[in-house]
Every structure is written in C-alpha cells, then in structure tokens.
Amino acid sequence: ISGLVYFLPPFHRNIGKRLTKSAKVFFADHGLVCYLLGIKDLAGWNNHIYKGNLWENLVFMELVKTAHLRPGANLFFYRDQNGVEIDFIVESGNTLYFLEAKAGERIDEKKLSFKKVIPLFEKRYQTKAILLQNLSEPHVLKKKGYHCINPLFADVNL
C-alpha cells in the first residue's frame, strides 16, 4: 500500500487458507508508532502497556530486512484455533524456523509455544526454534532446545 504498513499472513500448507485467514498488521516506522502512543523515551517504552507488541513490531522489521536479503525465505505467523501462537515462522527450503519475540530479559518457559507447535511440523520439515529477546547480551545464547538472540545486536541469520 504505502510502505508504512505490512500484512503478515498466517502459515498454512494450503495456499488458499493463507489468503483467507486474518493477517497480522505491522508498521514500518517504529518511531512513528511510539510517537502516536505518546512514548517519548526509553523509560516510557519500558513501562508501556504495549511494550510486547512494540517489541514484536520492531523484531518484524528486522526480519523483513533479513528476509529481503534471502530469496526464497517466506515469513509467516502461526495461530491455532485454541489461540496458541508462534510470532513468526520463516520457511526456507525444507526448514521451518519458529521465532518468538519477547520484550523481557527473563522469560517464563511456560509462555513459549515451541513445545506445543513444533511437534506438529517435525514429520514434514526440519525445525529450529529461536527466541528473539530484548537481552543485554550481544551474543547468541543457547538454551534448552532453542537459541536466544537480540536482533538489535546480532543479525538473525537463518
């Protein structure tokens, strides 16, 4: 449309369902979104009710930059009928990268959907789980079954 808004389609093997299911909306200009929400500084961002949504939007824009550099990579999200969601899925060949965006440094493992969703796809695809987290650590951290990356410090190379 104008380049300010992106629509992220849901992941589904059936192309028709990708087109008919509701997409997620993201904004290209993170600064404009913060301005419209009245966020004037980092403290305002850290304490904002939409901090998680803002982080997900920021992560989305980092992934869009990465995806444009990798022909054939397709970016989606996943949500089932019970509301279980994976923020982003990158399809690259026979591999699905499951990406969760979390704004906090300390994450309750129960809030991650990797264990619920990845088994649904393991027979058909190779799978990898990545937590895109607002960490102060600039390096990739390996955790139980997934990697943690702050996309502001390190490129998300898939």
Where do the model's predicted regions map?
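Accessory nucleic acid-recognition modules appended to NTPase machines
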Residues: 1-96
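Arginine/glycine-rich "motif VI" loop of SF2 helicases in the C-terminal RecA-like domain
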Residues: 68-70, 116-126
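Short beta-strand-loop-alpha-helix junction that forms the active-site gateway
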Residues: 101-109
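Conserved beta-strand segments of alpha/beta enzyme cores
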Residues: 74, 128, 145-147
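Domain-level recognition of nuclease-like catalytic cores that cleave nucleotide substrates
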Residues: 135-158
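A short, acidic, amphipathic alpha-helical segment used as a generic capping/interface helix at domain edges
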Residues: 83-84, 110-118
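Short, hydrophobic beta-strand segments that form beta-sheet elements in well-ordered domains
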Residues: 127-133
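Switch/connector loops and helix/strand junctions flanking conserved nucleotide-binding motifs
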Residues: 35, 108-109, 138-142
